[in-house]
Amino acid sequence: MENSMMFISRSLRRPVTALNCNLQSVRTVIYLHKGPRINGLRRDPESYLRNPSGVLFTEVNAKECQDKVRSILQLPKYGINLSNELILQCLTHKSFAHGSKPYNEKLNLLGAQFLKLQTCIHSLKNGSPAESCENGQLSLQFSNLGTKFAKELTSKNTACTFVKLHNLDPFIFWKMRDPIKDGHINGETTIFASVLNAFIGAILSTNGSEKAAKFIQGSLLDKEDLHSLVNIANENVASAKAKISDKENKAFL
């Protein structure tokens, strides 16, 4: 017993040998690929954070982007206040940057429904002058609902044309499926239409239905504006009728 205790005490008194550690610094180099996607290579964020017009998302200038958008859409005219962040969200589609940035999907859905409501009201109240008033009272034109023109007012083609005519497309952040092919194949029509609807949804959710309705009636459905949805829809309907007429004429030849 005494021998075992002596052995333990001796073992505890043994000096502890320090471990020799050699610290080495290792430098790693990460290659960030630019250009077309290649499997296994990490892409440079800058390559997918630019929109088709070359604008870098992280370097958006408020004066060059948001302020111009406010002016184009005449937001101050209706007392509408949208933050820079919300405007940028309205301009950003889900396809951009793998959906990592705030995008406009829900605002688009909200705005599309409110636009349909306002265009229905517009169609009900806008008939021919002779039919609009009966006995000095406003007559609602229910026959206007469901017409080709009424449907065209809220079509994606009409909204897309509105965005292009007002030069909003350079500010839109989205990803082209194939940069070599034209915008139609890349889904440009749907994406541009979603931006206009998103602005309506943003105005409705932050400024209220009254200002949103005034914005639609004043900026989008003004007959005096050559680039309004009303005049664009009229041109689209006339163009469609002309194409049908041409086909019928060729069929008889």
UniProtKB/Swiss-Prot annotation:
GO molecular function: ribonuclease III activity; structural constituent of ribosome
Pfam family, one: Ribonucleas_3_3
Keyword Mitochondrion attributed: yes
Keywords from the UniProt entry: Mitochondrion, Ribonucleoprotein, Ribosomal protein, Transit peptide
Role description: Component of the mitochondrial ribosome (mitoribosome), a dedicated translation machinery responsible for the synthesis of mitochondrial genome-encoded proteins, including at least some of the essential transmembrane subunits of the mitochondrial respiratory chain. The mitoribosomes are attached to the mitochondrial inner membrane and translation products are cotranslationally integrated into the membrane.
Cellular localization per UniProt: Mitochondrion
Any further remark recorded for this protein: Present with 6500 molecules/cell in log phase SD medium.
Family label: Belongs to the ribonuclease III family. Mitochondrion-specific ribosomal protein mL57 subfamily.
Species per Swiss-Prot/TrEMBL record: Saccharomyces cerevisiae (strain ATCC 204508 / S288c)
GO BP field: mitochondrial translation; RNA processing
Transit sequence range: 1-28
GO CC, any one term: mitochondrion
Residue ranges that the Swiss-Prot or TrEMBL entry lists as coiled coil: none
Lineage top rank: taxon: Eukaryota
Major subcellular site: mitochondrion
Name of the gene encoding the protein in the UniProt record: MRPL15
UniProt protein name: Large ribosomal subunit protein mL57
PANTHER family in the cross-refs: 54S RIBOSOMAL PROTEIN L15, MITOCHONDRIAL (PTHR28160), LARGE RIBOSOMAL SUBUNIT PROTEIN ML57 (PTHR28160:SF1)
Subunit structure: Component of the mitochondrial large ribosomal subunit (mt-LSU). Mature yeast 74S mitochondrial ribosomes consist of a small (37S) and a large (54S) subunit. The 37S small subunit contains a 15S ribosomal RNA (15S mt-rRNA) and 34 different proteins. The 54S large subunit contains a 21S rRNA (21S mt-rRNA) and 46 different proteins. mL57 forms a heterodimer with mL44 and stabilizes rRNA expansion segments 1/2 at a membrane-facing protuberance close to the point of attachment of the ribosome to the translocon in the membrane.
InterPro entries in alphabetical order: Ribosomal_mL57, RNase_III_dom, RNase_III_sf
Gene3D superfamilies: Ribonuclease III domain
